[in-house]
From Swiss-Prot:
Chemical reaction(s) catalysed: sn-glycerol 3-phosphate + an acyl-CoA = a 1-acyl-sn-glycero-3-phosphate + CoA
InterPro entries: GPAT/DHAPAT, GPAT/DHAPAT_C, GPAT/DHAPAT_LPLAT, GPAT_PlsB, Plipid/glycerol_acylTrfase
NCBIfam families per record: plsB (TIGR03703), PRK04974.1 (NF003441)
EC supergroup of this enzyme: transferase
Name used for this protein in its record: Glycerol-3-phosphate acyltransferase
Major subcellular location class: membrane
Keyword Lipid biosynthesis: yes
Pathway field: Phospholipid metabolism; CDP-diacylglycerol biosynthesis; CDP-diacylglycerol from sn-glycerol 3-phosphate: step 1/3
GO MF assignments: glycerol-3-phosphate O-acyltransferase activity
GO biological process, one term: fatty acid metabolic process
GO cellular component term of the entry, any: plasma membrane
Keywords: Acyltransferase, Cell inner membrane, Cell membrane, Lipid biosynthesis, Lipid metabolism, Membrane, Phospholipid biosynthesis, Phospholipid metabolism, Transferase
Family per record: Belongs to the GPAT/DAPAT family.
Amino acid sequence: MSSGQSFSHSLLKLPLSALVKGTAIPSNPIDDHHIDINKPIVYALPFRSAVDLLTLQKHALELGLPDPLSPLEIHGKSLKRYVFIASRPTLVQSDNDVPSDSIALFSDLLALHAEDSELDVQVIPATVLWGRKPGKEGNNKPYLQAMNGLQKAKAVITAGRDCLVRFSPVVSLRYMAQSHGTDSSIAHKLARVARIHFSRQKLAASGPDLPSRQVLFARLMKSPAIEQAIEEEAKNKNISMEKARKEAQDIMDEIAADFSYSLVKQGDRLLGWLWNKLYQGLNINNAATVRRLAQDGHEIVYVPCHRSHMDYLLLSYVLYHEGMVPPHIAAGINLNFFPAGPIFRRGGAFFIRRSFKGNRLYSTIFREYLAELFAKGYSVEYFSEGGRSRTGRLLPAKTGMLAMTIQAMLRGLNRPVTLVPVYIGYEHVMEVATYAKELRGKRKEKENAGLVLRTLRKLRNFGLGYVNFGEPIPLNQYLNEHAPEWTKDIDPMGASRPQWINPVVNQLANKMMTHINDAAAANALTLCATALLASRQRALSKDSLIHQIECYLQLLKNVPYSKTYTVPSESAEALVEHAISLDKFVIETDTMGDIISLDRNQSILMTYYRNNIIHLFALPSLIAQMIIRQENLTVSQIQQQVAEIYPFLKAELFLSHKEEELDELVVKVLNELVSQDLISLKEDKVAKNQANTLTLVLLGRTISETLQRYSIAFNLLVSNPELAKADLEQKSQDIAQRLTRLHGINAPEYFDKGVFASLFSTLKQQGYLDSDGNCDGEKTAQFATLLYALLYPEVKLTIEESVFQLKSA
């Protein structure tokens, strides 16, 4: 570096340190991008800019990366550690050619690779973005533009606090040399590829240009499908075309978002304060996968589970902080009240009625609006369950939005569409007490400003929040596999709804929900709730609780559930202490130590948190219950029983393991129980270790309430094979409700109608009922006997008496 450059850099550092507060994306590029800091590193920046270079330097050093201004020494040659892909325009001219010194550096590096087969220089493309405001539709400006000195000074002053430093995945020059050679033309090609790459980075951070709402409405009104729907509306209601058009305009105004970057930017500060007020921290996992999709030009559809109204804000906040564009969010029309509605709308929410069956004009406009969002490249978010889960379990998916997504693809989108499942978890859900009341029969309170204010008054520290991005589902690939000729149904007019859509959407919905559960986050509270609720008195000594949490942690770590779920890194003791600090347990002390328990009210609320992760323990718990309730089992007997019960658990809890994987998985779980000294395995015979029976009993009881429900339904069928589906559902609910009173079962979902509805659809799939609803008596009786064997005697007796009573009535 020349002395003149060094002096100018020194002069710039002071004002930049005061004006610029950038954010590095990702926050840990060495791990996220698998950067080997022992190999040579060169940074590539889009434009010649000392300000960008110094901003990059600051963040690189903070992140443990080499100083871009330090020389790169290779085989005695001293080279620059950075290149500019394009020159910066001055006030009087614009020079977008690749600087000759950059081409020279690339050429030198490629030549060195030709001489040394072991050399591998890593090029890290890095972009410094000053503000993320999207452009306006019709401006026809490139996504990423160079700035002259005055423009850069203005950007630093106005957007210095909204600066992003994006580090992209490394480009291996060894790979480039082996794939494309080392002559000088490759250096030019490398620079051209980098320029395209930088434009995509900017697009991923800012999103596509935004239209004005009126321009958008005018474009929608010209849609042939909407024009036809307006004509039908006028004809069917016997009104003028002008009045029908006014209705269409009103519907568009009700639905459409009015995205405002300035609101998102200001809201980010408010939400930052809110999360710090509410939570001790946010744990975000697998965001790098989503960033890659955005940068590769995918149309991203986020499909999170729905725990709380906080979900709307949390996911947008996380995406913004991860350097991506907050999505357009499908929100229920119940949230369109003053003042929340207008704020949500400007934050990207578009509103949807709970039902619009039979309203052709509304459904057509909504479908066309959604297709417009996809066509223009805006990311979209909708809650797959349709509403917030009141039980903490994942609800079966509502398929309407998913079907409309597929229909939008049939318009001929020119980009791949990818679903991104998202698991959102909390150590405290603000509405959880309200959910318990609603499950006991209280009417849901309509959302309003007063409800918001009452909620805000309760703000306090709620522990940790979790956002885990699940394994993406590429829809183009999915359709290629499940509807190979789908492209033949592409219709730019949007009138296509082929016969294959319904079955494909139903399968896709199940896969989507399974991927959400695959990305679950176990945490201190969910683990402690699971253990305490498994105890008969909802109480454990502190030592027993710690021991039980240790059992759970070892199972989760040593028998992995999926690739995307997360397990706490803290010790069992630290997790218990953290859960106690959330002030949800009753702590009593006697001469032998602390006893941790749940009062009746908290027992009901804690089922919500247990249900968040019950699927993670479904199989280990089932195996433990078999060992506790049956003597002298062999491994093959356990495998056989698991194979019979698993399909019901899989359907109800959206479990991901395939049936053909079960035998191997059972062996892995048994081996882990052996390593924890809970059981012994001798010549294929399984025996419980009496010294550690409590841990095994608690593990087994987690799934026992689910098995009780199955036992109720199957024994009703055995007693009365002619029962119609509606009668079977009602009688099962009646017996389940009776069990809750007689045996102190506090789970609100225990007699939930939806849970039984899921069970009965699986009865048909597994051949216990035929397509006409006729029962296979022998098969059903055998399964009912197996379920009885897994229940505790007092519960079994209550079910037997209740079934007999209902049959005699």
